[in-house]
């Protein structure tokens, strides 16, 4: 269960969301943005379709948008900072001329060392401006490998198409049967192929895409009651249950920590 201590965002529509938290485990989930995680205390076993390994204090690891991953702390809770940069923020850090194509992080984990030390030290500060973080990120990212190919290119055309259809229809509830019918394949074939490639069943992926979109709306200051309606949750209680499954806390607690909750 995630135990959030603090969370801050510099902009109403943030290019860089920073979260400080402690956690004992995360069930399989994903985020709609890039994730850069710096372990401050403890260690955790990380697992995704792209990589798996143990991250320790001082290490920094990475996930691409919609990359399913899970974590379990080896002993006590782990304390960590997570940066959720937008694509525009990463493009600026990397000084890329074109920003309209895909961009994926190929590096999985950087071990504690000169490449990670500056960023970890910057994140130790109680208050730090985005510009300072950006400078530290730029230096650390120079040690990473990036690709202009899609991070999902290896999952197969069927799964890629299914993922895109789900994301494009994230404002409405969808059944696996409906998705399979729209794609012209049998439900069992879709479930088997999708689950193997992505790391979760399509129905779970659908719910989590809606929850990820809810989180985006919440960082923009959209009231919780409106978020639940916009994303076709049956009611506020349903939204709260699904959000807590993914992030380990109710959406109200997330919004208050973010400082964007409009009463």
Language model segments and positions:
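N-terminal regulatory/effector-sensing and dimerization cores
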Residues: 2-102
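Histidine-centered active-site/metal-ligand motif
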Residues: 29-31, 69, 186-189, 203, ...
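Short, conserved glycine- and acidic-residue-centered signature motifs
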Residues: 32, 155, 159, 207
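Residues that scaffold the ATP/ADP-binding catalytic core of kinase and kinase-like folds
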Residues: 47, 92-94, 205, 227, ...
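Short hydrophobic/aromatic patch on the recognition helix
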Residues: 58, 190-194, 238-239, 243
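An amphipathic alpha-helical interaction segment
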Residues: 87-94, 102-168, 178, 189
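Terminal helix-turn-helix DNA-binding modules in bacterial transcription factors
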Residues: 164, 168, 173-177, 195-240, ...
């Amino acid at each position: 269960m995630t135990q959030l201590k603090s969370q801050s965002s510099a902009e109403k529509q943030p290019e860089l969301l920073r979260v400080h938290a402690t956690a004992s485990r995360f069930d399989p989930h994903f985020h709609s943005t890039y994730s850069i995680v710096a372990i401050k205390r403890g260690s955790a076993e990380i697992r995704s379709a792209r990589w798996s390994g143990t991250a320790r204090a001082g290490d920094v690891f990475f996930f691409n948008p919609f990359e399913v991953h899970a974590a379990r702390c080896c002993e006590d809770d782990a304390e960590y900072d997570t940066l959720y940069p937008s694509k525009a923020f990463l493009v600026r850090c990397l000084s890329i001329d074109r920003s309209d194509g895909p961009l994926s992080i190929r590096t999985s984990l950087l071990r504690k060392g000169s490449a990670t030390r500056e960023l970890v030290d910057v994140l130790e500060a109680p208050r730090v401006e985005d510009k300072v973080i950006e400078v530290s990120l730029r230096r650390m990212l120079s040690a990473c490998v990036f690709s202009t190919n899609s991070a999902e290119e290896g999952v197969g055309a069927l799964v890629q198409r299914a993922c895109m259809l789900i994301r494009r229809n994230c404002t409405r509830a969808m059944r696996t049967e409906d998705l399979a019918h729209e794609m012209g394949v049998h439900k069992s074939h879709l479930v088997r192929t999708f689950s193997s490639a992505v790391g979760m069943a399509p129905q779970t992926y659908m719910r989590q895409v809606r929850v990820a979109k809810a989180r985006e709306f919440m960082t923009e200051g959209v009231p919780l009651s409106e978020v639940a309606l916009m994303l076709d949750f049956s009611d506020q209680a349903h939204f709260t249950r699904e959000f807590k499954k993914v992030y380990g806390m109710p959406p109200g607690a997330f919004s208050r920590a973010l400082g964007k909750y409009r009463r």
